[in-house]
A protein has these predicted regions:
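Short beta-strands within extracellular/lumenal beta-sheet-rich domains
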Residues: 68-85
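Cysteine-clustered segments with highest specificity for TGF-beta superfamily mature ligands
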Residues: 1-33, 119-187
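Low-complexity, serine/threonine/proline/glycine-rich extracellular segments that form mucin-like
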Residues: 96-98, 104-110, 232-240
């Protein structure tokens, strides 16, 4: 919960988490050959008035995506938003966290509305590959320890490729996230989808005019001058 870390995370800096508990396991005689895993994530949603409005949906839970476990695919519906109208480009970001996505084992995939997602460091057939990546699709290298293979932990955020709005269309109100595998077993426990949406932004406008209708804002006036205040509203958002 946010309240656990609010008093600790008060400024920019380096924060270290330790002693995340996990039971001991052995891959040799464990039923699905995965052993045990543990990890943690801190997902922060912030407000920036300079950015376009977004619908942000987050899911926390736990699921096993496994061929041997009989659960090789999982569809997760996302709704409650409306994307921007045509012809504007639809922009979206996707954040995620999983356990046990092994680097050398292929077959794990992430799809959005039926389209495979990938980045330079996350191939479409080995998306969960024991790495920590950022919005630029490059690894996060200022970690400690800074191993290129986390041995079973994945977290990151990526820009959803959406050429010609072919993955997420204009005026869309829902999407489907699909996690699947044909080989590697992995355990997703968090994801979030942020989609640009239609949003008005009403700004109050105020103009001071003289008796002739001239704008006299910032000009000195004399005692007895007639002043007219013109109040209005201006929508600076993307909703008509």
């Amino acid at each position: 919960m946010t309240s656990i870390v609010t008093g600790l995370v008060t400024d920019l800096g380096t924060y270290t988490v330790a002693n995340v508990s996990s039971a001991q396991g052995r891959t040799r005689d464990f039923g699905n050959n995965t052993g045990h895993s543990a990890g943690w994530s801190l997902y922060i949603v912030y407000e920036d008035p300079a950015l376009q409005g977004k619908s942000i949906t987050s899911f926390d839970g736990f699921s096993a995506i496994s061929v041997s476990g009989g659960n090789a695919a999982l569809d997760i519906p996302v709704s409650g938003f409306r994307t921007v109208p045509s012809p504007a480009p639809v922009r979206a970001n996707f954040a995620f966290a999983t356990l046990e996505g092994d680097s050398p084992i292929l077959g794990d995939q992430l799809l959005l509305n039926g389209s495979n997602l990938s980045t330079a460091d996350r191939p479409s057939t080995n998306f969960f590959n024991s790495s920590v990546t950022q919005l630029s699709a490059l690894p996060v290298n200022n970690r400690n320890p800074n191993s290129t293979n986390t041995l079973g932990f994945d977290t990151g955020v990526m820009v959803v490729p959406n050429p010609a709005n072919s993955v997420i269309a204009n005026d869309a109100t829902s999407a489907t996230v699909r996690l699947e595998t044909s080989g590697d077993t992995y355990f997703p426990y968090f994801f979030s989808l942020a989609v640009d949406i239609i949003e008005p932004n009403i700004v109050l406008t105020k103009i001071v005019e003289d008796a002739l209708g001239n704008d006299i804002g910032g000009i000195l006036v004399n005692l007895g001058d007639e002043l007219n205040y013109v109040l209005g509203f201006n929508n600076t958002g993307n909703d008509d």
